[in-house]
A protein has these predicted regions:
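Non-catalytic beta/alpha edge segments that cap or flank active sites
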Residues: 1-171
Length: 171
């Protein structure tokens, strides 16, 4: 079966949880979380849950696992906490809990960041995607530019396809 055939069979409405990882953001100041929600809704998807957690491994782990255990959520998307500062632990936390990594997501995100956005600073960009308990997880940097790039160029075009592939044998 071709990729196009897979996409035709993919679900059209994906139920999502957004997790913003930040020590400083509030619901009022969380531009990246709001942008994720806006782009998902514009594409016809649903936001089932949203939360902001501190840059702490246990808080991140708990928020992601809650999303993956929720029966009405298909995908968990995180933003923030992906840099190289000591407190940036989102990537390490997600990497520890996923059962399977979608390696191409991080690779393509850095390539697009380099060619379309921030040039050589892309080598500092960290992004990861994977699967836990039959749910997809995508983790992006917290800048609105990075969120827009990841969402419009990678996540939204493949979201239904990713969920379809996971559902084939994870449930």
């Amino acid at each position: 079966m071709s990729v196009n055939e897979h996409k035709k069979e993919a679900p059209h409405v994906i139920r999502c949880k957004i997790v913003t990882v930040s020590d400083t953001r509030t619901e009022e100041t969380d531009k990246s979380g709001k942008l994720m929600m806006q782009l998902l809704r514009e594409a016809g998807h649903e936001i089932v849950a949203y939360e902001i957690v501190k840059d702490e491994k246990e808080a991140i782990r708990a928020a992601v696992i809650r999303g993956c255990e929720h029966p009405e959520i298909d995908v968990v998307l995180t933003n923030g906490g992906t840099g190289i500062a000591k407190r940036d632990v989102t990537i390490e936390t997600v990497k520890e809990i996923i059962e399977k990594e979608i390696v191409g997501f991080g690779e393509l995100f850095r390539m697009l960041s380099y060619t379309e956005d921030i040039g050589s600073a892309a080598m500092l960009s960290r992004a990861i995607a994977g699967v836990l308990d039959g749910k997809a997880i995508f983790s992006t940097p917290g800048s609105t530019g990075a969120v827009r790039l990841a969402m419009t160029k990678l996540i939204l075009p493949e979201l239904g396809h990713v969920v379809r592939e996971i559902r084939k044998d994870w449930r």
